[in-house]
From Swiss-Prot:
This is Alpha-glycerophosphate oxidase. Disulfide bonds: none annotated. The gene is glpO. It comes from Streptococcus pneumoniae serotype 4 (strain ATCC BAA-334 / TIGR4). Its EC number is 1.1.3.21. GO terms for cellular component: plasma membrane.
Amino acid sequence: MEFSKKTRELSIKKMQERTLDLLIIGGGITGAGVALQAAASGLETGLIEMQDFAEGTSSRSTKLVHGGLRYLKQFDVEVVSDTVSERAVVQQIAPHIPKSDPMLLPVYDEDGATFSLFRLKVAMDLYDLLAGVSNTPAANKVLSKDQVLERQPNLKKEGLVGGGVYLDFRNNDARLVIENIKRANQDGALIANHVKAEGFLFDESGKITGVVARDLLTDQVFEIKARLVINTTGPWSDKVRNLSNKGTQFSQMRPTKGVHLVVDSSKIKVSQPVYFDTGLGDGRMVFVLPRENKTYFGTTDTDYTGDLEHPKVTQEDVDYLLGIVNNRFPESNITIDDIESSWAGLRPLIAGNSASDYNGGNNGTISDESFDNLIATVESYLSKEKTREDVESAVSKLESSTSEKHLDPSAVSRGSSLDRDDNGLLTLAGGKITDYRKMAEGAMERVVDILKAEFDRSFKLINSKTYPVSGGELNPANVDSEIEAFAQLGVSRGLDSKEAHYLANLYGSNAPKVFALAHSLEQAPGLSLADTLSLHYAMRNELTLSPVDFLLRRTNHMLFMRDSLDSIVEPILDEMGRFYDWTEEEKATYRADVEAALANNDLAELKN
């Protein structure tokens, strides 16, 4: 379905003419999830995003649908249970996006180690029980030191005592956002990026009835009326709540910055994702992950009070990560000059909430009695003297300072909150990308209750656990063969096998629409056929307005294909210029945007 600059203009026009049931401010993963469920449930839905979709936090994650094994150090079972359950749901509704990728976790005998081999085994067995993969080929394995080094011979040998392998999944975070957005558009939502909420509309009683918005492309200011407005702006949540300039000024959010660095795979060759302690005794862990022909690693976790739109990688961030990675991979000797790309993102943590990210933070402790009982039960389970039900009973009796009962009752998912201010504004904040659907579901339950009670508007919510995103109309049990069939269709349209498979995996059930463009398009000068098709599909069906949108978020060219990027920037500018009829001045502006984004990702300031 068309989702383009033209439909954007039409959506802005319609938003001015109607009273919406729900207006969503924020087009990251949280807002995208709410938009999909609202539109599919029949609500008159609008969404505005001041940047591009996923430009903030939601395209700057570690790019995993991570199960949170680390939380089991404190046997924080609720968060892991929720996370692996939601991960399974994402596999159902977006089966072309998460890809299984077993994680290697080496264990070192050192101060501050997260796991001993025994604790790791207990944690992995619990993890498998929660994920439902016990006694399957995906079940965990405990490895000896030699077995770890056989898998990853370039790891540091000193202090290594063994390790484990457990099931995890890689993710394309920005694609997950756009596929939710596209499905909402398909179901009738009115959606526009580069539109900023600058204030609220109020009735005589002080209740919010809409927003004053600015189209950042035309500078047009207009009003959008809505029965309910929900704020899903992540790190910007406080700023949006404070737009009313009435009463309390909110300071709920405590953003932290996470940095990832990308190098060529020749600098660190990893055959699978690796997850290990920093070795600094700071209680944190770091990922090293293969992607395309690159290796990336992260993340940092530092409090952040700077520019929310443009968080930057600092020398301190680089030194921290390079020190850790060079220690664990002593033959790598990576320097800042080896870094090909990078990104810095902000986690929308809620101040005072016990849930940090899955790489760090103190998630509390459990009592010695609870721990000893659990260990004894798990040992008996492993020797077949106890049942899974016995383990689950022991888990349920854990006395944890981070138990769900200690969370704010407004939480709709671990680490998230749903609040309604006196003026009627709803704010859905916090959480993790894996939990986005559950967060949206909790918010939508509240939304339909309010619409019924206060506006006599009745809606029946969809079952969002089975409702596919755009591109997700695949049989989850047969994804590989369906993707293969799409790839062969691409080959029949003139693509080589590698390109066809790349696009089939990227677009899922939308791949035939991408390949069909080959009938009407000529290959753009300087671009491959695959890039030509992908670019035109992005402009026509993914509301892609700039080269940076395409290179950084609709695809991963800017992050993981740095070698070939310089050669396609000008051809992309030319092709987008032809499509959008840009003037030379407009093209120069977009060229400058690309150069600025590349300089930022390449760490040009730090290297000079």
